Regions:
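Core catalytic lobe of class I
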Residues: 1-115
Length: 115
């Protein structure tokens, strides 16, 4: 089995792929938390609209039994995104995976406090 990993803007990169050609999509999108200029939307609705374009492109490239995962850190926005997915796509939601980071968003000096 052959695997390829791409680190790129997902909307740009996925346009290169044929329909139903990808087994797994894993994205770490902007979180709309406003820390950087590329991570600011006027409203949650605008952010969900942007992410909807991403989800539709993922839906296009995924194989019928493919999977996709995305990271996020704002539960209220996750609910809005899940509502969009349930209403506007054929994806079947399976479960949340929670990665509980002890020092999420903290300076790196706190990452290895057990060393």
């Amino acid at each position: 089995m052959e695997y390829e990993i791409y680190c790129d803007d997902c909307l740009t990169k996925m346009k290169e792929f044929k329909d139903n050609s990808i087994d797994l999509v894993l994205i770490d999108p902007p979180y709309n938390i406003g820390k950087d200029k590329w991570d600011k939307w006027r409203s949650v609705e605008d952010y969900v609209e942007f992410m909807g374009k991403v989800f539709k492109e993922i839906e296009r490239v995924l194989k019928p039994n493919g999977s996709f995962y995305f990271f996020h850190n704002d539960f209220l926005q996750i609910v809005e995104l899940q509502n969009w997915i349930n209403t506007n796509s054929n994806f079947i939601f399976k479960s949340f995976l929670i990665w509980n980071k002890r020092y999420n968003g903290s300076p790196r000096k706190y990452y290895f406090d057990n060393v």
